[in-house]
Amino acid sequence: MTMITDSLAVVLQRRDWENPGVTQLNRLAAHPPFASWRNSEEARTDRPSQQLRSLNGEWRFAWFPAPEAVPESWLECDLPEADTVVVPSNWQMHGYDAPIYTNVTYPITVNPPFVPTENPTGCYSLTFNVDESWLQEGQTRIIFDGVNSAFHLWCNGRWVGYGQDSRLPSEFDLSAFLRAGENRLAVMVLRWSDGSYLEDQDMWRMSGIFRDVSLLHKPTTQISDFHVATRFNDDFSRAVLEAEVQMCGELRDYLRVTVSLWQGETQVASGTAPFGGEIIDERGSYADRVTLRLNVENPKLWSAEIPNLYRAVVELHTADGTLIEAEACDVGFREVRIENGLLLLNGKPLLIRGVNRHEHHPLHGQVMDEQTMVQDILLMKQNNFNAVRCSHYPNHPLWYTLCDRYGLYVVDEANIETHGMVPMNRLTDDPRWLPAMSERVTRMVQRDRNHPSVIIWSLGNESGHGANHDALYRWIKSVDPSRPVQYEGGGADTTATDIICPMYARVDEDQPFPAVPKWSIKKWLSLPGETRPLILCEYAHAMGNSLGGFAKYWQAFRQYPRLQGGFVWDWVDQSLIKYDENGNPWSAYGGDFGDTPNDRQFCMNGLVFADRTPHPALTEAKHQQQFFQFRLSGQTIEVTSEYLFRHSDNELLHWMVALDGKPLASGEVPLDVAPQGKQLIELPELPQPESAGQLWLTVRVVQPNATAWSEAGHISAWQQWRLAENLSVTLPSASHIIPQLTTSETDFCIELGNKRWQFNRQSGLLSQMWIGDEKQLLTPLRDQFTRAPLDNDIGVSEATRIDPNAWVERWKAAGHYQAEAALLQCTADTLADAVLITTAHAWQHQGKTLFISRKTYRIDGSGQMAITVDVEVASDTPHPARIGLTCQLAQVAERVNWLGLGPQENYPDRLTAACFDRWDVPLSDMYTPYVFPSENGLRCGTRELNYGSHQWRGDFQFNISRYSQQQLMETSHRHLLHAEEGTWLNIDGFHMGIGGDDSWSPSVSAEFQLSAGRYHYQLVWCQK
């Protein structure tokens, strides 16, 4: 029977979800994850606890447009319209309601603490049985690890409690509500609450019970909290494990706590004590707490490089040794501190190779499973990341355990963001919102502070700087002085942060925004009185085809010790799978669900696609972050290790000298490099090739044995140097055959054997080529000065909000996309050994000349067509995206072969990871399937390209695919692209960089812009 105080009407009348002073009702205090083992050996080995029962699985679910629409009868029994959904899940992924993607703008009308009357509500119910022994003794708790955004809980028709903060557990005592036989849970989840105003993160806005639900049975007298910390002497040869244990229940003199420390099967230390701590003040000590200190000689230290872990088992027992319960956690002996302007781990200055990670899955929304978490960690480790920022909320509890075990440094961030407020600190400077903010910070610390991987606490993200931040900064520093605190809001260098932690500050360029200037990172270090380390909390915005200029950051990080790295934005594209009318899956972004407001494709900023397939930019990050650096002097390779703690023990250095991709000599040397040490490797006398070509020395560091995070043969580092080559002159082969030139009113036609070339005299273009009777071109060869806009080219510009400073808008305004060619010259001459076609075009828009292109085509007796191009750029037109040629080839070949930089896509400001070699890949691999189509697939530094029956030689960049730049520009999603007839070839003499410092302002560095007034390039085109 539902009591009147438990009724739905009473709960609705209170409107707890619109009261910032009510963040919970009856929720239990925060603590580290518990399992309440009743066997200490099971606790030591982390076996499943019989006292912890998962409630994940099928629940009954009914959706309503508002909480007032929920019938009172639902508290007693399932509704006829109820469906079955899997918990954990987001209800939007089951077709209820729509996910909303927005970055800054709140998805609801801003009127804190009030939310819309139309407040989608999900009603979950589950019927379950409880073990009889659980009812007879002890306490049974229910734990919701994550519910978005707020919920009320009933058990057997009786109201239990209320919780909000979607990213931390809400735990309730069910003991008084359970009964023998069947029990029924009813959970009413509201999409919007006053807490939503603190959760304005750049992500999909989804709802539901999206993390695990479990029951935990603890004894009446129980461990209610425990906290472990490690202390060291100066040289880390001796350590102390401090374990503070708190109990609740009936305090008896015979109660004891034993803390034992294990390394595998070996007990390292152990201590036992009764409750009653040290005297705190004139009123005495805590009777329900005790601190034990265990001495450890020569501890094996924890780091991301060598994640040594011990296991601490905390036993609550009687004086005669009878175990009441045990809790346990992994322990990493490590020390984090800031000293002399440097962030130190175990006394060594860290270089943060970090990335921001949202919890996202293309099929499951914000539900994380262990397989996905492990996959993310393995990919991060394999690509030389050593740190992750939990952007922008505490993650699933398992994530931290995995980071402890595999080795990643973690910035644990409170679930606070008020980016859409004006000003941003409207709530964070308001004392009425301090309780809500406080719970989000303090409960995060209380849950996660036992994890060695957590090396920095973060007060949240993009919430301005308010007095509440200062208060919470001081709380953390008082409760946990063992870790620094960072917070970017208010300018990245306020009194609420131990680390200067800007986002998107540039290496050398100041961005003097009012009140919150972003100085260049080099300048920031030298500001008067500034002594803190600088670690970018976000940098290198990896949206679409991006990460240009990444190497510039890493040059600065290695040059300035107090520039200690940063966290790339971000790890994974947040696209979601939808299905078309035929059941085919496609990747969706903001607006594709009818969601308003929305920020389109801005949710896709990842180094990996949503399915965790790497973007090409990930390879650039891997290369720049590699832990081995190389220098070549003569025939000596100097290898420097940037590992702080790890001596190389699983690395071979492979070296190879190749001429135009053909190996001439190679060798292998085991690496034996101490942490932060060097090794000199003497190469033998290198061969001197007799023929012309590019001579390259390539070194690769290979791991011969598999590790916890990589397979055998994993390449962790590499470098290339171009070596000096012998000078040689290649004389053209004499041919007694001269191509035949035929002139008509419309065309110049050149014929040589079974090959023909046709130039249209009215357009001045190479209009067709034949090999025998087969046409080779579907479109003429013409100049190209534009590209399908990248996200970085578009910036924040969109149909309803034009940003005139965006590259794409500047190109459009100047007429680059609309320019048409006016023929200035088209002549043909027969030379002694060749036919020469000379053309000139003025590319014009609205009567204004933007470019003048002059070309010569020299077709000789060998059938080669040498093309020389000279381009003049108008001084008052924006720098073009590219200067090159394009055509649609008739052939569709299976593979592409080239001599140049590869194998992955590379651009002028993102090519340090690419290697010069001869590459051969399927045509499909030349296209990068960015969800939002754009320019893609470029390969730079090309000396030779072979495709079908064609060959091109010179010094150029190219991309080749089934999609034209026009189609890429006009198509909103990759699944809407259609393979066109033939193959589109773009050959560029010059291509602008792609940028990537951020994606909302022009970020291509000056040295990678096409700012010259004249350009010259050449290439040779022949048929095989």
UniProtKB/Swiss-Prot annotation:
Keyword field: Glycosidase, Hydrolase, Magnesium, Metal-binding, Sodium
Active site, per annotation: 462 (proton donor), 538 (nucleophile)
Top EC class of this enzyme: hydrolase
Gene3D superfamilies, alphabetized: 2.70.98.10, Galactose-binding domain-like (2.60.120.260), Glycosidases (3.20.20.80), Immunoglobulins (2.60.40.10)
Example GO biological process: lactose catabolic process
Keyword Hydrolase: yes
Enzyme Commission code: 3.2.1.23
Gene Ontology CC entries for this record: beta-galactosidase complex
Reactions that this protein is recorded to catalyse: Hydrolysis of terminal non-reducing beta-D-galactose residues in beta-D-galactosides
Record InterPro entries: B-gal_small/dom_5, Bact_Beta-galactosidase, Beta-gal/glucu_dom_sf, Gal_mutarotase_sf_dom, Galactose-bd-like_sf, GH-type_carb-bd, Glyco_hydro_2, Glyco_hydro_2_AS
Residues with site note (Transition state stabilizer): 358, 392
Cofactor list: Mg(2+); Na(+)
Positions bound to Mg(2+) 2: 598
Residues involved in Mg(2+) 1 binding: 417, 419, 462
Record bears the keyword Cell division: no
Cofactor descriptive note: Binds 2 magnesium ions per monomer.
Residues that bind substrate: 103, 202, 462, 538-541, 605, 1000
Residues bound to Na(+): 202, 602, 605
UniProt-recorded Gene Ontology molecular function terms: beta-galactosidase activity; carbohydrate binding; magnesium ion binding
Known partners and oligomeric status: Homotetramer.
Family: Belongs to the glycosyl hydrolase 2 family.
HAMAP family: Beta_gal
UniProt name for this protein: Beta-galactosidase
